[in-house]
Amino acid sequence: MKQLNSLYNSNAEELLGRVTLSGKNIFNRSAYILVTNEQNTPKGYKAIISAHDFSDKISTPCIKVDNISGFNEGDVINISPNGEVCFLYEINSASNAIFATARCNHRCIMCPQPPVQQERDRTDFNLNLIKLFDKNTQEVGITGGEPTMIGDSLFEIIRQIKKSCPKAAISILSNGVKFADIDYAAKLAACNHHDLQIDIPIFSDIASIHNHIVGAKTFYKTVQGLYNLAQFGQQIGLRVVIHKQTYKRLPQLADYIYHNFPFVTQVAFMQMETTGLAETNLKDLWIDPYSYNNELREAVLLLNDRGITTYIYNAQLCVLTPELRPFAKQSISEWKDVYLPVCDGCVLKNECGGFFSTNKNNISTHIHKIECTNSCTE
């Protein structure tokens, strides 16, 4: 998520609020954080953020930052006692998500966010956060950690999204293991959300390889979870993170998916984000994305030709062959999506997924500017 560090903070407790730039009626201010450079600082707001100094007489919590240009009307931010400002919801973003928990029942060798064993329950905080979302929000993710680790509280979050953002599609990133419990899968279905998809990773058609990658012997629980979700008519996406230990069997995995999970809504093959445990295990995981184009091509075309919607996430168009580029999606969250100087002037830059900001030291040696397409020579 996007974060700012304050230069001054008079606040001694955590504050959650919706940003307003224009001000609110005095009877409707208590949930808002006013962001302004005006010297006049009205009362009644949860906090005031400015790039100017504050008077010592102001009783409202005050936070000084370098610049207020990054704030937008309707953003939702959290201000910690140490003055860190976290953007938990951005009104202009299509990548807003609820972080359900940092706990997980897997320890994937390439996890960008290593799990914790214990933490404070976030459910009440998240329910209050969702209430501050704009009612016209089009999509909300639920992520972690492993969201099902919070048990039935997951369904409270889904119902609150449904109430506060009735138009929003929901995407849940889960390892699928908990859904091997058919009663739990039934509870998800009972939420009766109009547009909810569970995205579940599967890393190999061979159980032992998958289990090694996720750090747990759960392959068949994930498979059972997929069948239970399908039994209740849930939308399911499959995700495959590509690295040195998964790329060789991509075609076999694609064939396995087609024969065993023909009911899935989509399959996404994903370039790896090299932070967290992925960085720790980089020597065992890193392979230049250009080097697995043949395996990726075979897997993508196998599924696509058989009617399964197939995408490529987090990939740079110049690394993919022209045949694969139509499958690539801009999937990296805006706050950590960057481009390199070599990308300047590329005719496909606006369509390209870019790079994870955390991946700057681990990029393909085949990155280059595309100066023309179709019959031209790149």
Cite the ranges covered by each PLM segment.
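Canonical Radical SAM [4Fe-4S] cluster-binding loop centered on the CxxxCxxC motif
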Residues: 89-123, 356
